[in-house]
Every structure is written in C-alpha cells, then in structure tokens.
Regions:
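Mixed-charge, Lys/Arg-enriched low-complexity segments
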Residues: 2-22, 86-113
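Negatively charged, low-complexity tracts enriched in Asp/Glu with abundant Ser/Thr
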Residues: 2-49
Length: 113
C-alpha cells in the first residue's frame, strides 16, 4: 500500500511526465491557514486562524516546471492534497475545512481516471 506521499508523487509524476526516479525533498513548516489557502476556503469558516502543518515537495524538475505538490494537516486531520502550478494557482485533489470535505478526488491518486 502506497503512502499518501507516494501516491501524490506517482500522480504528479504521471500528470506532468516527470522523471520517475527523481528524488523529492520535503519541506515541512507550520503556517496559519489564512496565509496559505485561497480566501474563499478560509474566510469566516472553520479553518480561520487554524495552524496547518504543511509538507511541500521539491525536486529539480518540479522547480523547473514551477509545480509544488503539497499535503496539509491540521493536528492529525488531513486538510488538503494538491499542488501549486506555474500560475501560482492551487489545484486540489482533496480539501477539507475540518468539519466537512469541500472536494474529494483522492480516487485520482490511486490510479482512477
């Protein structure tokens, strides 16, 4: 069974035709949801002022493509899976506001179309 990180790497690698054997580095920081997520998902909602644990993935090829995959947690709860693209837009495969899922396309991570 692949970890969430492995599933995300597999998905992004295939989506953007990246080298399969390239090592990814991970940067982990804590940041307030309001500073990370687009306003419409945070403003006046349950994520306001919540501290998120962010895991952002890097490699030479990802950097050249300006693609930054990420996984976000609040405490132990999964909040978001996705990537930031070359236009600095956040594309989500999964987004949860701590109370209910706003978007769930995790089936894409396990090879579904």
């Amino acid at each position: 069974m692949m970890t969430l990180e492995q599933q995300l790497k597999h998905y992004i690698t295939n989506l953007f035709s990246l080298p399969k054997d390239e090592k990814w580095e991970c940067e982990s920081i804590e940041e307030v949801a309001d500073n990370i997520l687009p306003d419409q998902y945070v403003r006046l909602g349950p994520l306001t002022n919540k501290i998120l644990h962010t895991y952002t993935y890097y490699s030479d090829t990802l950097h050249e493509s300006n693609i930054y995959p990420f996984i976000l947690y609040h405490q132990k709860q999964l909040i978001a899976i996705g990537y930031t693209d070359e236009n600095h837009d956040m594309d989500f495969l999964y987004l949860h506001n701590t109370i209910m899922p706003l978007l769930d396309q995790r089936y894409l991570l396990t090879g579904g179309q």
